């Protein structure tokens, strides 16, 4: 299982990578790298995806620099992490806590 402290350590040690595709999606969604960093620093893991390939990943919820809830999907590659995607959670898809998916 991935833990938030490990993801925070990756950030503190410049071991987090963002693909060009993910960076383009952030721009489209109005998300800045500093928002993602803040979300990781303030966040908690809300879902684990241990079977993801090629590396396990997780969904965390934290706050942007403007204190907006932000979801970030990150991998744990053993010695680094990759940002897979980030988005502002949609209240139509998430319960009011923004941590629980609606069914």
Feature map (PLM): residue ranges:
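Ribonuclease/tRNase effector modules and their secretory precursors
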Residues: 1-103
């Amino acid at each position: 299982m991935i833990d938030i402290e490990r993801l925070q350590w990756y950030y503190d040690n410049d071991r987090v990578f963002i693909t060009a595709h993910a960076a383009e999606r952030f721009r489209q969604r109005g998300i800045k790298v500093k928002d993602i960093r803040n979300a990781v620093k303030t966040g908690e893991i809300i879902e684990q995806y241990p079977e993801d390939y090629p590396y396990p990943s997780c969904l965390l919820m934290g706050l942007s620099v403007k204190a907006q809830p932000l979801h970030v999907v990150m991998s744990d590659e053993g010695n680094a992490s990759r940002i897979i995607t980030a988005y502002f959670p949609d209240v139509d898809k998430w319960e009011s806590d923004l941590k629980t998916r609606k069914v």
